[in-house]
């Protein structure tokens, strides 16, 4: 994880091209005035049929489905883990050693919401959630 940690602020984005549409931490609700949400990751909108990509080399430790969020893949980088959610097709299996920028899976396209394709991305150090925006290059 030393290499991962040394690359803070310089990791490639988990998509080829995208824009952050949901920020980390406590955010005001877009519609409901007195409601806040506490995001444990970031939401990145990208082009339909885009792939999620590993931000650093590591080992695939989990892949599973979450109701309402399609599939999730977790990659371990020593003491760190990256989480990629809202995937449909998964290209990797548990135990795979993958490289930075390697495609992990196809991001879900929401046909009922203007064909939006949004990846939910998290970074963890052990059990402590990190702000992914502090890790990816600007």
State each model region's role.
Residues 1-62, 67-70, 76, 83, ...:
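Extracytoplasmic/periplasmic cell wall- or extracellular glycan-interacting regions that localize
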Residues 44, 72-73, 99-112:
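Short hydrophobic beta/alpha edge segments that flank linear recognition/processing sites
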Residues 63, 80-97, 101:
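Short histidine-centered loop motifs in beta-beta connectors
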Residues 20, 58-60, 95-107:
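A structural signal for short beta-strand/turn segments enriched in small hydrophobics and glycine
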Residues 65, 89, 109-112:
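Short, conserved catalytic or interaction motifs in soluble domains
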